[in-house]
């Protein structure tokens, strides 16, 4: 585990590269998690990807082991993109494949739009592009203020997984990690997401994009991912059946295989 300093505090990151040392240097995959969780949501991707790529995971600002900004701090997509590029610079990744889930997917699309020379491909899971079409998130602040953060956590777990979608120990880890997340950072990220509208810019994104979407996210209907797919000039869409929002965790094997297949054909 390592850390890089930014003007908003430090970002914790980790690099795993199990590729053969006698081959060409591995390309870099940079993972960006979503709200209320940390870099370990990607842990089950590593057995599939780390033998082929240098895998870089980090805890998003306000999450996990990274610094939690004060409540007065301003959150913006520009700053979130800056965090991505800061981590990439720290590991000397001039170019990288960017994999993001939920708001991490939205930030990934934004980064590819604004730094296309840095991002080789984007893989976006459970991702929205228009905040006004995202369900549930607009109620987060009321839930936290009126019922408490524990109530928010309980509702979120219902939205993330169908019963039995992950092993009990995975479910418990996810729930405990989410319960320890910063309430004010969580709300700030939700409100940042709700303020976004990338729809007018997506046709300018020439980089290859793979969209992986659950069929039953309580936040984002499949039609939203289909709209993103229709706006992007170079994209593919995969829908995972009988899955709620947290497919980065519940369907790591399937999503990793889809990423590897996508890369083999487009890169």
Residue ranges and their predicted role:
Residues 205, 211-213:
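Short beta-strand/loop motif that positions the catalytic acidic residue
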Residues 132-135, 146-203:
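Conserved alpha/beta-hydrolase catalytic His-Asp/Glu region
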Residues 216-220:
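Acidic catalytic loop of the alpha/beta-hydrolase fold
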Residues 33-35, 96, 100-102:
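Conserved alpha/beta-hydrolase "nucleophile elbow" surrounding the catalytic nucleophile
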Residues 106-114, 118-148:
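Flexible "cap/lid" loop of the alpha/beta hydrolase fold
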Residues 78-96:
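Conserved acidic catalytic loop of the alpha/beta-hydrolase fold
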Residues 9-69:
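Conserved HGGG/HGGXW glycine-rich cap/lid loop of the alpha/beta-hydrolase fold
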Residues 235-267:
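Catalytic active-site module of serine/aspartate enzymes centered on a nucleophile-bearing elbow/loop
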